[in-house]
Amino acid sequence: MKIVVPVMPRSLEEAQEIDLSKFDSVDIIEWRADALPKDDIINVAPAIFEKFAGHEIIFTLRTTREGGNIVLSDAEYVELIQKINSIYNPDYIDFEYFSHKEVFQEMLEFPNLVLSYHNFQETPENIMEIFSELTALAPRVVKIAVMPKNEQDVLDVMNYTRGFKTINPDQVYATVSMSKIGRISRFAGDVTGSSWTFAYLDSSIAPGQITISEMKRVKALLDAD
């Protein structure tokens, strides 16, 4: 299970001031570019990709439709993704599939897609269908993050992850049940079949997230003989 840590600089200066030494134990960096105004993203990109050269990087534009900070039309969303991909070819590109389904055809040639679904209100009743539809598209990674209302919601996400991973062993999944009651899902990836877990360095960006140091301690405990 790899540890993913988001970075969200709000300016070029903040990007340049990131202390790289704090990320030594991080497996994957997620650049949450939605912390920036749309017109600043291309200008800040060189600082991010140069600073984290040697790390795997996810480029993410988390829109307000799925709990992020930026408002983009479908055309603007795809244009920014394509521009970043053509210049920097990041290891992974997050694509909010259900929020931008109309333009997904323009992404079919991308081998590095993380097809994602985020719901900060609930764990929808059709969660199995969401797993199924994303899996059928065979992206690099299927990512699902939903908000539980009770313990059963947490168990449903974990069980569906295990079930779909068993049937599709070559598909990478990154799933999480958010909030305090869902926190166990962040640690159980080796059992459920979720290959990524998300932690934070300075401030949490999702309910239930924990720090890198806390995640490392838990992983060490779980990995011990």
UniProtKB/Swiss-Prot annotation:
The keyword Amino-acid biosynthesis applies. The active site is at H118 (proton donor/acceptor), K143 (schiff-base intermediate with substrate). Pfam families: DHquinase_I. GO terms for biological process: 3,4-dihydroxybenzoate biosynthetic process; amino acid biosynthetic process; aromatic amino acid family biosynthetic process; chorismate biosynthetic process. Pathway: Metabolic intermediate biosynthesis; chorismate biosynthesis; chorismate from D-erythrose 4-phosphate and phosphoenolpyruvate: step 3/7. Disulfide bonds: none annotated. This is 3-dehydroquinate dehydratase. It comes from the Bacteria. SUPFAM superfamilies: Aldolase. It comes from Streptococcus agalactiae serotype V (strain ATCC BAA-611 / 2603 V/R). Its EC number is 4.2.1.10. It catalyses: 3-dehydroquinate = 3-dehydroshikimate + H2O. Keywords: Amino-acid biosynthesis, Aromatic amino acid biosynthesis, Lyase, Schiff base. InterPro entries: Aldolase_TIM, DHquinase_I, Type-I_3-dehydroquinase.
